[in-house]
Amino acid sequence: MNLENVKFNTDTKLVLNIGDPMGKTNAPRAYNKLFGELDMNAIMLPVEVKKGELPQFMEACKMLHIRYISPTMPHKKDIIPLLDDVDESSRIFQSVNAVRIDEDGTSHGVGMDGKGALNAILSSGVQLVGKEALMLGSGSISGVIGLELSKHGIRKLTILNRTVEKAQEIADILNTHTSMETKALASTPENLDQAAGTAQLFLQVTPLGMA
């Protein structure tokens, strides 16, 4: 990996990607490539932090003046009580994957999954206002994507999942916090055909293809 952009001095921004286990994480490779393309004096390193060790880890980061943390599983939810504030999507769906620690020690968490997904959709020129969307899957990012869809004008969202109870939990939260109509259905061929017949946007957020 080309690290010519990293000066390895006191101005170098150190970003710690934390989780357990960390053997297969691809985030440092992706972020360090981006840092290089942007000529940023920054580097991301993977750090294995065991479940239950987050309080000590956060204190160590403050002591060592480490400003940026990228939590992955199982810390996306567990880190929230240790932060001073989080953004709306993180608060509603209890998932943070970017943390900034200011010089005074205050910590701020945001969730980027929903925003990233919406940026990808909008960059393709898709118009969302007044449209109906169909989402297949109800994993950890489904809710935050749904929240962003509502902010960008989606009128109705149907979530299909093999375990309909999981989809219903997300639908209930979205119906409580947004004006978008959201319903959950079991993932059957009949329900898929019916929902697809009126949807203008399809989102595949199941684990299929992640391996």
Predicted regions and their residues:
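Rossmann-like adenosine-cofactor binding region
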Residues: M180-A211
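Phosphate/diphosphate ligand-binding glycine-rich loop within oxidoreductases
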Residues: N2-S124
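Glycine-rich adenosine-cofactor-binding loop
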Residues: G19, H108-G114, V126-I154, N161-K166
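Short, conserved SAM-binding/catalytic segment
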Residues: I170-E181
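Short glycine-rich anion-binding loops that position phosphate/pyrophosphate groups of nucleotides
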Residues: M73-D78, I141, P207-M210
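Receiver (REC) domain switch-region micro-motif
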Residues: I69, A133, F202-L203
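Residues at the starts of beta-strands that form the adenosine-phosphate
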Residues: L14, I43, E132, R155-K156
